[in-house]
Swiss-Prot record:
It catalyses: aldehydo-D-ribose 5-phosphate = D-ribulose 5-phosphate. The keyword Chaperone does not apply. GO terms for biological process: pentose-phosphate shunt, non-oxidative branch. The lineage of its organism: Bacteria, Pseudomonadati, Thermodesulfobacteriota, Desulfobacteria, Desulfobacterales. One of its GO terms (molecular function) is ribose-5-phosphate isomerase activity. Keywords: Isomerase. Catalyzes the reversible conversion of ribose-5-phosphate to ribulose 5-phosphate. Belongs to the ribose 5-phosphate isomerase family. Its EC number is 5.3.1.6. The active site is at residue 108. Pathway: Carbohydrate degradation; pentose phosphate pathway; D-ribose 5-phosphate from D-ribulose 5-phosphate (non-oxidative stage): step 1/1. Homodimer. InterPro entries: NagB/RpiA_transferase-like, Ribose-5P_isomerase, Ribose5P_isomerase_typA_subgr, Ribose5P_isomerase_type_A. This is Ribose-5-phosphate isomerase A.
Amino acid sequence: MTSQDALKKQAAEKAVEYLESGMVVGLGSGSTATFAIHAIARLMKEGKLKDIVGIPSSTPTEEVARSLGIPLVGFEEHAVIDVTIDGADEVDPDLNLIKGGGGALLREKVVAQATKKNIIIVDESKISDKLGTIFALPVEVVPFATASETRFLESLGAKVTVRENQLGKAFKTDNHNRILDADFGPMDDAVKIGMALSQRAGVVEHGLFLGTTALVIVAGADGIREMKAA
């Protein structure tokens, strides 16, 4: 395990301390959230967490949770999630996020908006003063609109890359859409950018998670610290 993975695991272990038996839990996506899923499964097997059900935010997360024996449900059974534990690609001092590095930003945002308390787990390298400083903004678009939305993002000042998979072909999301990675640099007004993107017909969703997070657990060389919403 790398030192970065060890930090992620520490943060995940701290996050699951906020779970209680009987909860509906949102299961995040990506390597950091996977550590939390494993921790949840272990606590269930030990009998320390009972009657937990999960709502996964991506197909890979669903597969991991099923393999570990975590019961899964949909929004048809539970429209409200008690706690979601997820990672992030970047976090600012106000707990606003950039997410979508793994391409699951649409379902992740649906889960986040249905959640009473969102807990984000990151290592120290993901913290910045302004969103866009360390990570480009993922924007999910319908394939038909790839070129037009690329031009629109460029008109806003972003350098845009069409995300590719490991085979060098266009990356497809769980919903069969494309991802444009828009590098704005440090954003002075992330809210304004988010609003502009939300008005575009070809944009399915963007990776700005603004005002959804209650708690960020940060793992660093000096240990664990918590950032809470004001």
